[in-house]
């Protein structure tokens, strides 16, 4: 990637981050930072990826407080078991489980789906939260650029593998939900179908933005497919905003310095960042409502490109090809 294009990617991502952070500051100064009030969710079962830390951990805990049974999915068993233990201690219940999941490995994704099936639980909610951000170029076990592989392709396959359980658990007036975590960086992203893996030109900023736009395209295309099939499942995007998490460890020194000194003021805490995810997961007004982009517990408008149905179809087909889910017989996925 040329120096000019790489610099443009950095500046665009920073500009979006600054705009979101300032909006959060204004909201905080207005006293508008309040958690959503949601009804109890007894009997519901949720899977949260990346629930061993940050937004995912806070999301899992908040869902458990609503009465859901939560499956903590992550690649750090020690931290995962700590989250499960804390939920069980707080709730006085054993309705929390840890299952290993490495989204950088399609074999691990398939193994997770089998492990979940072995639990014998229904599935009412899938929160696609885990992700990587601004990492130097590296590839997953399957040869995918890591942002694309972890953020998009891993969740793509996971969702397809779990859709039969989501369908079976949903009912008219009480459907299942898929909540995919988005980012405002998708507004400055492009999906390069000719070089998805950044082998010819790479910028961690462009790669992250591309992965988030890919997730938006995926979430909206998924809703179109669910609608066509008449499935009792909805698919929405939830943008947590700029949140103080470990993801910034690969960011440039400017962003890390700003986070260190101003994070307490302009960044959301993981607990606050989880509010939009939990709202998408449990708000009664979203029953049967899909294809939405949610931010600050309200509907927002995604980038117009995210609604490009031709690009949605092309990316979906490429996702099927890359993950091997196209035929579906071996994994129980049929389209």
Curated annotation (Swiss-Prot):
List this protein's GO terms for biological process.
dolichol biosynthetic process; positive regulation of autophagy
- What positions does UniProt annotate as the active site of this protein? 208 (proton acceptor)
Write down the top EC class of this protein: oxidoreductase
* Functional pathway: Protein modification; protein glycosylation
The record lists NAD(+) as bound by 55, 208, 212, 245
Q: In which domain of life is the source organism classified?
A: Eukaryota
Subcellular localization, as worded in the UniProt entry? Lipid droplet; Secreted
UniProt family annotation: Belongs to the short-chain dehydrogenases/reductases (SDR) family.
Q: What else is known?
A: Autosomal gene, which is the ortholog of human DHRSX, located at the termini of the long and short arms of the X and Y chromosomes.
Protein role? Oxidoreductase that plays a key role in early steps of protein N-linked glycosylation by mediating two non-consecutive steps in dolichol biosynthesis. Acts both as a NAD(+)-dependent dehydrogenase and as a NADPH-dependent reductase during the conversion of polyprenol into dolichol. First catalyzes the NAD(+)-dependent dehydrogenation of polyprenol into polyprenal; polyprenal is then reduced into dolichal by SRD5A3. It then catalyzes the NADPH-dependent reduction of dolichal into dolichol. May also acts as a positive regulator of starvation-induced autophagy.
Q: What is this protein called?
A: Polyprenol dehydrogenase
Q: Top-down, what is the taxonomic lineage of the species of origin?
A: Eukaryota, Metazoa, Chordata, Craniata, Vertebrata
